[in-house]
C-alpha cells in the first residue's frame, strides 16, 4: 500500500471508488453483526436458552471487545495505514462469524461472538476518518450517509439470507456461509484503496494536517467540546432501542404473528432495507443542505426524527394486520436511521483531521457499549420479566416500554443543537490552523 504524498485526497484514489469499497465492507460488517437476530429463533430452540441468555450472547459478548478495543485501534489508525487496519479487521470478523457456526453450546457461541466484536472494532472509526479525507465538508454528510447505508443494507441481507439459509439448511450453515463470503472484501480493501493525505480537504492549502497528537491531547479536546458528548449520548440512547429492535423484532414477529423464518426474513428484511436506506440517505442529504449554513441542523434532524419515530413504532406493535405493521415499522425505521449522516459528519468536523479516528472511536465506544451492550439485554430481560403476565406477547410490551429511549434521544439532540454551532466553528479554526 503506497503512502500518500502531498495534495488533495482525490490524487490518491477516486472518492466514489473508495466509498463503494468501504460500503461493501460495511455491508458485511452488519450482515455478520445482525444475522444473529433472526438466527436467535432456532438457536433458542436448539440450545434451550432464555431471552436473557440470548441477549447476553447478542449484546454483551459482542459489545465488550467491540467497544473496548475501538479506541486503541483508532489511536493507531490516526498514525498508521487505515487501509491496512480496515482490511485486517474485515478478515478477522469474517473468520469469527464462520466460527460461530461451529459452536455446540452457549459459551462456545458467546466466545465466537466476542471474536466478531474484536474484528469489527477496527472497521468503522478508521473508515469514518478515511471517507472524510476523500470528500470536502460540504459533501461529507452525504458521503458518510452513503457509507452508512451499509447498516440497513447489511442488516436486511443478514435477516433475509440468515432466515433463508437456516430454513433450507440450518443456523450453523448460515454463520459459515456469510462469514466466508466476507473474506474477499478484505482483499478488495487492501488492493483497491490508496491511503490519502490526512485532512487534505480541511487545511488551507490542501496539505497534510499535523501529525496525530498524544491521546491525552485528544481527550482534552473532547472534554472541552460539550456537543461531542451530547451527540454521543444522543446516539447511544437511540441505539439502545435501535440495536434492541434489530435483534428482537424477528423473534417478535415469530411469537406474535406466528411467521416462519423465511417469512420473517422477507418481511422484516424489507422493512430494514426500504426504511433504512431512505432514512440514511435522506438524513445525509438534508444534513448537507441545512448543516453548513446552520450547524445546529445536524442535531435538529435526529431530534425531530426520533420524536416522530417513537409513536410510529408504538402503533406498529399493535397493528391489526401485517400490511399496516409494515407501513408503520418502515416509516419508523426511516426516521430512526436519519441521524447517521448528520451526526457522524458533525463529529468529524468538531475535531481536527488528525484526531478524527480517535474521536470517532470514542463516539462509537459510547454509542455501542450502551446501545449494543445494554439495549439488547434490556429488551430480553424485560421480556423474561413480563413473560408470566403476557406470555408470548411479552416482547411486544418490552419494546413498547423501550420506546422511551427514542424520546430521551430526541431531548438530548435538542440540547446538542444549542451547543453545536460554537464547537463546529472552533473545529474549523483548528483544522485550518493545522
Predicted regions and their residues:
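Cytoplasmic helix-loop-helix junction between adjacent transmembrane helices
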Residues: 112-152
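Extracellular/periplasmic helix-loop-helix junction of adjacent transmembrane segments
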Residues: 39-68
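Central cavity-lining transmembrane alpha-helices of secondary-active solute carriers
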Residues: 59-73, 270-283
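Extracytoplasmic gate region of multi-pass secondary transporters
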Residues: 36-37, 225-281, 336-340, 344, ...
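Conserved MFS/SLC helix-loop-helix module at the cytosolic interface between two early adjacent transmembrane helices
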Residues: 68-104
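Juxtamembrane intracellular "pre-TM" segments in multi-pass secondary transporters
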Residues: 5-11, 198-232, 256
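Helix-breaking motifs and short loop linkers at transmembrane-helix boundaries and internal kinks
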Residues: 48, 81, 102-108, 136, ...
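Helix-loop-helix hairpin linking two adjacent transmembrane segments in secondary transporters
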Residues: 147-195
Amino acid at each position: 500500500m503506497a503512502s500518500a504524498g502531498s495534495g488533495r485526497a482525490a490524487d490518491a484514489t477516486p472518492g466514489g471508488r473508495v466509498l463503494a469499497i468501504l460500503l461493501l465492507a460495511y455491508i458485511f460488517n452488519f450482515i455478520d453483526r445482525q444475522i444473529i437476530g433472526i438466527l436467535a429463533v432456532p438457536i433458542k430452540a436448539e440450545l434451550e436458552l432464555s431471552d436473557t441468555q440470548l441477549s447476553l450472547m447478542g449484546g454483551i459478548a459482542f459489545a465488550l471487545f467491540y467497544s473496548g478495543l475501538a479506541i486503541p485501534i483508532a489511536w493507531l489508525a490516526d498514525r498508521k495505514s487505515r487501509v491496512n487496519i480496515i482490511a485486517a479487521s474485515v478478515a478477522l470478523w469474517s473468520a469469527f462469524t464462520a466460527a460461530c457456526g461451529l459452536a455446540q453450546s452457549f459459551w462456545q457461541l458467546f466466545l465466537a461472538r466476542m471474536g466478531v466484536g474484536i474484528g469489527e472494532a477496527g472497521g468503522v472509526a478508521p473508515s469514518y476518518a478515511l471517507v472524510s479525507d476523500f470528500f470536502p465538508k460540504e459533501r461529507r454528510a452525504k458521503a458518510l450517509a452513503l457509507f452508512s447505508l451499509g447498516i440497513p443494507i447489511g442488516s436486511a441481507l443478514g435477516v433475509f439470507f440468515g432466515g433463508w439459509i437456516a430454513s433450507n439448511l440450518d443456523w450453523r450453515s448460515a454463520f459459515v456461509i456469510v462469514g466466508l463470503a466476507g473474506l474477499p472484501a478484505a482483499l478488495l480493501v487492501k488492493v483497491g484503496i490508496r491511503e490519502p493525505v490526512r485532512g487534505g480537504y480541511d487545511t488551507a492549502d490542501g496539505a497534510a494536517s499535523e501529525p496525530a497528537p498524544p491521546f491525552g491531547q485528544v481527550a482534552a479536546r473532547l472534554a472541552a467540546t460539550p456537543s461531542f458528548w451530547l451527540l454521543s449520548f444522543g446516539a447511544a440512547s437511540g441505539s439502545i432501542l435501535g440495536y434492541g429492535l434489530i435483534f428482537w423484532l424477528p423473534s417478535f414477529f415469530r411469537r406474535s404473528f406466528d411467521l416462519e423464518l423465511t417469512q420473517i426474513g422477507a418481511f422484516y428484511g424489507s422493512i430494514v432495507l426500504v426504511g433504512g436506506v431512505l432514512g440514511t440517505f435522506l438524513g445525509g442529504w438534508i444534513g448537507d443542505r441545512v448543516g453548513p449554513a446552520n450547524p445546529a441542523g445536524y442535531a435538529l434532524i435526529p431530534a425531530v426524527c426520533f420524536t416522530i419515530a417513537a409513536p410510529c413504532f408504538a402503533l406498529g406493535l399493535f397493528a391489526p394486520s401485517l400490511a399496516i405493521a409494515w407501513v408503520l415499522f418502515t416509516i419508523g425505521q426511516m426516521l430512526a436511521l436519519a441521524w447517521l449522516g448528520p451526526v457522524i459528519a458533525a463529529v468529524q468536523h468538531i475535531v481536527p483531521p488528525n484526531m478524527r479516528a480517535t474521536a470517532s472511536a470514542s463516539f462509537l465506544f459510547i454509542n455501542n457499549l450502551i446501545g449494543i451492550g445494554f439495549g439488547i439485554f434490556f429488551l430480553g430481560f424485560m421480556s423474561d420479566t413480563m413473560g408470566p403476565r403476557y406470555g408470548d406477547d411479552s416482547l411486544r410490551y418490552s419494546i413498547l416500554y423501550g420506546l422511551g429511549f427514542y424520546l430521551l434521544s430526541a431531548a438530548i439532540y435538542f440540547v446538542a443543537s444549542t451547543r453545536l454551532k460554537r464547537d463546529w466553528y472552533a473545529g474549523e479554526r483548528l483544522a485550518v490552523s493545522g
